[in-house]
């Protein structure tokens, strides 16, 4: 078995990639034909529905309420996540292009998986979809995109499609357990999206550990313009994160509050990150790794508690703490994990998604357990935590306990599911790149030949362990030449 897994890698995907894409897309067409239908607000019978329910205006259609949030979330998925992964000096095509591939396949599979768990009409056997389903599908595929961040530059597009197939499936199951069986509240997905997606990617990366990855060390870094492109992704994510955390919250005060809390958490996180990044450098200079990534951790951590009455200063505290935790993670935890736990995390998703997501889940548990009628009002408590039906007698303390349990479920699903999927992806049939060919677009993309040679002085081995030592060596060699 060891010899089987240790066979020579071959990045040839001319047969496997078209085959997987064609077969799975045809399967989607068939499954959509069998199961998927328009819901009453997107069906042509909407006119009759308006008359029956005394609706006088099309403005009551959910499209006009949800679509602005859907637009923002959609931009985050395709532009924000995509460009955030373009920091590698020779892997920008793969960063944004494979992000596009994962998302395009994942949203189709997510509409089916989430539909079977949440929206299946048992009387007809059909799944009826509208604009809210599109938002949820984007949320679902976000978990797989986060996992991709841990594997960036080290896997083939076929492996990424397999990762997405299992990732969306696992997401739908853990989401059903957390939101329906445990009755947790997680509007912005700190638990179900970020904690799960982060640990899912880390679990896969741990199994796919490459002891000879140093052979691609020359490409495991950024250049000036690649970091600028990555910063574009950061800014899109940062600007639209309030929409992400509030997109599927209840109409009214909950959605309004979620946007405010996220807005403040993000702002606080930026200042904290800048302060720590500057403190770490002897000359007070800022590190783009921290600015691109750790500045977003506040939005991740505010996901669960976004619609709760955490208060504006509470949101600032969460962002402040996440800025510290995430920046320290990039400085010290990521090198530790690679050296001692053999965990290679290209984008540092452990610091941006996994830990802040887990922290956000526990923050939500504490805030839920501390909720009182004097702060929320009786009706406000019922509405915020959905204490209705069989949950009408649930206390806030019990709700806090279930919120904490939901966080543990998300982490467990991510780690265990990631390890299992990692073993599947370890089979040498997926066309993954050799150790000396990682982080290089030429393995899977036609790269223009007329690229200008980048002067060594503009290169710096960012997103790497011992990078400061490498910078010093590079600068020294340039000065001597």
Swiss-Prot record:
It comes from Takifugu rubripes (Japanese pufferfish). Residues 1-15, 89-92, 154-159, 209-227, 280-288, 338-351, 426-481 are cytoplasmic. One of its GO terms (cellular component) is apicolateral plasma membrane. It is found in: Apicolateral cell membrane. This is Ammonium transporter Rh type C 2. Homotrimer. GO terms for molecular function: ammonium channel activity. One of its GO terms (biological process) is ammonium homeostasis. Specifically expressed in the gill by pavement cells (at protein level).
């Amino acid at each position: 078995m060891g010899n089987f897994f240790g066979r020579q890698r071959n990045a040839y995907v001319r047969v496997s990639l078209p085959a997987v894409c064609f077969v799975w897309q045809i399967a989607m067409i068939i499954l959509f034909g069998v199961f998927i239908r328009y819901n009453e607000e997107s069906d042509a019978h909407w006119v009759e529905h308006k008359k029956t329910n005394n609706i006088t205006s099309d403005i009551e259609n959910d499209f006009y309420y949800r679509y602005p949030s859907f637009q923002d979330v959609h931009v985050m998925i395709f532009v924000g996540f995509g460009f955030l992964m373009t920091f590698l000096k020779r892997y920008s095509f793969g960063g944004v292009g494979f992000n596009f591939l994962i998302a395009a396949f994942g949203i189709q599979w997510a509409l089916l998986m989430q539909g079977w768990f949440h929206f299946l009409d048992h009387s007809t056997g059909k799944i009826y979809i509208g604009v809210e389903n599109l938002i949820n599908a984007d949320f679902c595929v976000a978990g797989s995109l986060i996992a991709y961040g841990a594997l960036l530059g080290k896997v083939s597009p076929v492996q990424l499609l397999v990762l997405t197939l299992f990732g969306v499936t696992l997401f739908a199951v853990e989401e059903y357990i957390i939101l329906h069986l445990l009755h947790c509240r997680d509007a912005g997905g700190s638990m179900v999206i970020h904690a799960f997606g982060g640990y899912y990617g880390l679990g896969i990366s741990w199994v796919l550990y490459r002891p000879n990855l140093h052979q691609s060390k020359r490409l495991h870094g950024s250049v000036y313009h690649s970091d600028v492109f990555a910063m574009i992704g950061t800014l899109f994510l940062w600007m639209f994160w309030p929409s992400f955390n509030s997109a599927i919250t209840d109409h009214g005060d909950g959605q309004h509050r979620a946007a405010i809390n996220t807005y403040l958490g993000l702002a606080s996180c930026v200042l904290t990150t800048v302060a720590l990044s500057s403190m770490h450098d002897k000359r007070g200079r800022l590190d783009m790794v921290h600015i691109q990534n750790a500045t977003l951790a506040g939005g991740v951590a505010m996901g669960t508690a976004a619609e709760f009455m955490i208060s504006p200063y509470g949101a600032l505290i969460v962002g402040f703490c996440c800025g510290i935790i995430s920046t320290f993670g990039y400085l010290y935890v990521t090198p530790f994990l690679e050296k001692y736990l053999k965990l290679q995390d290209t984008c540092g998703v452990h610091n941006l998604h996994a830990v802040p997501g887990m922290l956000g889940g526990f923050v939500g548990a504490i805030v839920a357990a501390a909720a009182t009628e004097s702060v929320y009002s009786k009706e406000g408590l019922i509405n915020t935590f959905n204490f209705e039906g069989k949950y009408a007698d649930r206390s806030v303390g019990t709700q806090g306990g279930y919120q904490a349990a939901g966080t543990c479920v998300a982490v467990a699903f991510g780690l265990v599911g990631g390890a299992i999927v990692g073993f599947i992806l370890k089979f040498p049939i997926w066309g993954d790149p050799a150790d000396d060919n990682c982080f290089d677009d030429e393995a899977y993309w036609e790269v223009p030949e007329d690229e200008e040679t980048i002067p060594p002085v503009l290169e710096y081995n960012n997103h790497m362990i011992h990078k400061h030592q490498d910078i010093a060596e590079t600068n020294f060699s340039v000065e001597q030449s």
